[in-house]
Amino acid sequence: MRSTLKSLITAVALAGAASAQAATVHIYNWSEYIGENTLEAFEKETGIQPVYDVFDSNETLEGKLLAGRSGYDVVVPTNHFLGKQIRAGAFQKLDKSKLSNWDNLDPALLKQLERNDPGNAYGVPYLWGTNGIGYNVEKVKAALGVDKIDSWAMVFEPENIKKLSSCGVAFLDSADEMIPAMLNYLGLDPNSENPADYRKAEAKLMEVRPYVRYFHSSKYISDLANGNICVAAGYSGDVFQAAARAEEAGKGIEIAYSIPKEGGNLWFDMLAIPADSGNVEQAHAFINYLLRPEVIAAVSDYVGYANPNLKAGELMDQEVRQDPSVYPPQDVLDRLYVSAELPPKIQRLMTRSWTKVKSGQ
């Protein structure tokens, strides 16, 4: 009996040790949006194993969050989705006593973010960037006879995009990104609450639809880098990554990024802990790790997106830190718009319009 009891105690102890060693944090992030060694280094330092999945649209993430059983411990929503998700009870409050690196964040940015998250109670800024146009310099010159793209007219006017269609044009697969871009191009409010404005944007998108090869929010990275397409309406850092891959391949493909003269979207992505998280301690540990200047500096260097950490800039590769496509100068920032949270009826209208545009019917 003593032997059996002793064996039982040993088995329980071993199970406990194994459980402690098997601490995990389940992360749901945008594709191509973490440093090359970030997850590996975090696990090596903390013993917490990251279980990592990716998505490529806010709508996909929101569907999981609002279903109530996300299965994740850390997620990365864009800021203008955050307010609605907070009100829906999708997240739990941060325990800032577990975020010792919080003070590294830019207080001016934190103040701006309080619009959707009063007191910064639920969200931690991760990275920020812009939307614009990535393009193959040589192929665009051959198709259009121009050295650079400086206007949304290159993809939003049929006579231009038709010429580019032979070498391939991709659009982001997101109503939330592409419809406001068209509204802004048409001189309308990108955060309009007027249904008539959305009908105009839809009509214009339908004009160029025949010349769009595909809609996807990450595939264009490799396709630009490989020369499979020549133009993509996309995210700044994704185009940065495409350019870096093209350069590494050494095949003479030059990829450039433009924030068109009409302006574009400036956005902020946040780190948040879902209400159903089963590993809250580990979630805080991972977020706190990303708040370390040297960690987020390495992330920015790799993915080509700006970060809100005041101490990270000096630790970054200065070619990246001084790149105007990553950290735009003030005159460019002045012509950017920040997406607002829109009423549900407008969101539904955008979704219906986008379905029509993608189907071409």
Residue ranges and their predicted role:
Residues 81-84, 231-252:
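A ligand-binding cleft/hinge motif common to bilobed small-molecule-binding domains
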Residues 76, 82, 86-211, 221-225:
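Extracytoplasmic ligand-binding site segments that recognize negatively charged/polar headgroups
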Residues 222, 330-361:
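Conserved C-terminal helix/tail region of periplasmic/extracytoplasmic solute-binding proteins
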Residues 1-21:
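Gram-negative bacterial Sec-dependent N-terminal signal peptides
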Residues 269, 274-335:
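Mature extracytoplasmic/periplasmic domains
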Residues 198-207, 213, 251-272:
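Periplasmic-binding protein-like
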Residues 22-85:
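Early extracytoplasmic/lumenal segment of secretory-pathway proteins
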Residues 92-103, 153, 249-265, 274-276:
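Short beta-strand->loop
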